[in-house]
Amino acid sequence: MKKDTLLEKIKDLSDLDKHQEIIDMIEGLPTEQLNNEIIGQLARAYINVQNYEKAIEVLKSIEKDEKNTMLWNYRMGCSYFYLKDYEKAEEYFLKAYNLEPEDENIKDFLMDIYINLSKQVKFGEDDLDNQKKALNYALKAKDYMTTDDKKIECYSYLAFLYNKFTDYHTAEDLLKRAISLGRDDLWIHSELGYCLGELNKLEESLEHYLRAIEIAPSNTWLLSQIAWTYRCLGRYEEALKENFKALDLGEKSEWVYVEIGYCYKELNNYDKALKYYLEANKISKDKNVWLLSELVWLYNGIKKYENALEYLKKLEKLGRDDSWFNSEYGFCLIGLKKYNEAIEKYKHALEKENNLKEIIRYNSQIGFCYRLLEKYEEAIENLKKVLEKINGNKKNDKQMRRFF
């Protein structure tokens, strides 16, 4: 078969995706009919049937003559790319790029190679070296963007990285660029909503979360994020509505119960706040210090001091021993009429407090306990300390007197 006829036959079979027939035909040819172009077509056919190792073997048989051609390097790069050996693929595609820098297919492969190399880098929160390595690969990908679709892909991935590295301003810019180029899906609006939330641009964050929920109305993570955003904006009724949607869809998580409880607390509905906080605590099994502290505060607030004491003891087991904890403990003990114990807790709180307003409040409570114990001399001495604190802080004298 003449060379031109053979190449035409190969082209026709390739157009019909009959790549195995191409392989069988070329491998059945006598040696004298083979040349580098035909062997290159054999390698191409092996790539198309996903036998990349064989493609590399075939290409290496003509390496001496073809290693400085774009097509040979392109095919070697393709083979290594699909074998996920991205470093080798990079080597060959860079050679191909240097030979034909305007070829868009080469640029597309290089962009994909650098994104994949970036994804292969494993890093932790404090692993700055590997974070930088992952980012540098992704920034290289940016040099080879071609179409709007490739720009969207690259900007989106870079934004994902910058969000992970908490560089939310850069992530915001990249996500908005991707949207301006036409990306309008669940991921992009969820990612931008999260990013804007971290930047405290809550109204704008909400817009993107609401667009995302239009696309995926049953996405419980989105519903909880929308609820959280409403809650941060002080729109507690709307937050509750979204949290209950998530709950109805089966998202019976500690997070959702806590958010519902928090909203009810802010709406001064302490009974309902307690109900949902207690549901959350069943899940956390008395391990969430913040949640136990909220329960203490609520029980103290509705004068259920025995219940408050129960959760104070749980907090104590977890090691909480700051000024807030001791002051709440003291308040609870006053409610239980255990004034001497309350005094000790407030004294302990004072040892850990630097805020003048709180120091004055704790001393006032100690004085109050002494008065209830009919230890009037001690009460007077303690209240003198309060006055000394007030008068000793001339800058805030007026404010502190008003507080006292």
What is the predicted function of each stretch?
Residues 33-34, 66-67, 101, 146-149, ...:
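Short coil turns that delineate tetratricopeptide repeat
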Residues 15, 48, 82, 116, ...:
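Register position in tetratricopeptide repeats
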Residues 28-29, 61-62, 96, 141, ...:
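Canonical positions in the second alpha-helix
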Residues 19, 26, 52, 59, ...:
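Hydrophobic/aromatic packing residues within the alpha-helices of TPR/SEL1-like helical repeat arrays
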Residues 4, 37, 71, 105, ...:
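Start-of-helix register in tetratricopeptide repeats
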